[in-house]
């Protein structure tokens, strides 16, 4: 399958993140190639594409997860609120507070449900006990988990089901009140019922947050997102409103992937 590079010129009304000519390298391997797109504010944007296409790599550039590894580097611009995150001197912990992340596998901390939520908050704010109690309840309620755990807040997060653990991780992420929430295949390890709850939660979260989700599940992208980006071999092939991408894609490569003729 031969593809040629294309210019993606889709302007969104209120971009929260503006990516321009982004290139990313794992050592000498060129993983992302001249990516340019705008992530709309308080909308859900989905990244789709086959394994190894670069969608998770792109997601992780938004909060500089690659900074943990010296051999990895990004070039270009990722602008948020008028500041290029790639050259910004913003404290990395502060950046990750503004741009939260939930990973593919639920990763609760080895502590109580309450402390899972309170831990990150304590890094950035000094709250009284009653204020912290309110924040914990608020975050767990936002993550549609409060009703299930309110009577066992001091039990280990490890005692929750997989779907509950993932919602706990989402609650932990929003407890520090980020502006952007990154979800890297958050439902891939979950059963259909838990997946449905996460999808309902995503729909509610966009009222307050800019949400970006990586998913292998095209039906999930169609259900959950407002905008969709299709990637292949480190290139952005097509980006636009989800309904248009799935009903009338502009690129044959996108149509082939969505219809299952390629993938």
From Swiss-Prot:
Q: Where is the ABC transporter domain?
A: 17-258
EC main group: translocase
Q: Name one GO biological process term.
A: phosphate ion transmembrane transport
State where ATP binds. 49-56
The GO terms this record gives for MF are: ATP binding; ATP hydrolysis activity; ATPase-coupled phosphate ion transmembrane transporter activity
What Pfam families does the record point to?
ABC_tran (PF00005)
Q: Name one GO cellular component term.
A: plasma membrane
Q: What catalytic activity is recorded? A: phosphate(out) + ATP + H2O = ADP + 2 phosphate(in) + H(+)
Cell compartments where the protein resides: Cell inner membrane
Which EC number applies? 7.3.2.1
- Which region is the signal sequence? none
- Look up and give the membrane topology term: Peripheral membrane protein
Please provide the record's keywords in A-Z order.
Answer: ATP-binding, Cell inner membrane, Cell membrane, Membrane, Nucleotide-binding, Phosphate transport, Translocase, Transport
Q: Which family does it belong to?
A: Belongs to the ABC transporter superfamily. Phosphate importer (TC 3.A.1.7) family.
Q: How does it assemble?
A: The complex is composed of two ATP-binding proteins (PstB), two transmembrane proteins (PstC and PstA) and a solute-binding protein (PstS).
- General function of this protein: Part of the ABC transporter complex PstSACB involved in phosphate import. Responsible for energy coupling to the transport system.
Q: State what protein this is by name.
A: Phosphate import ATP-binding protein PstB
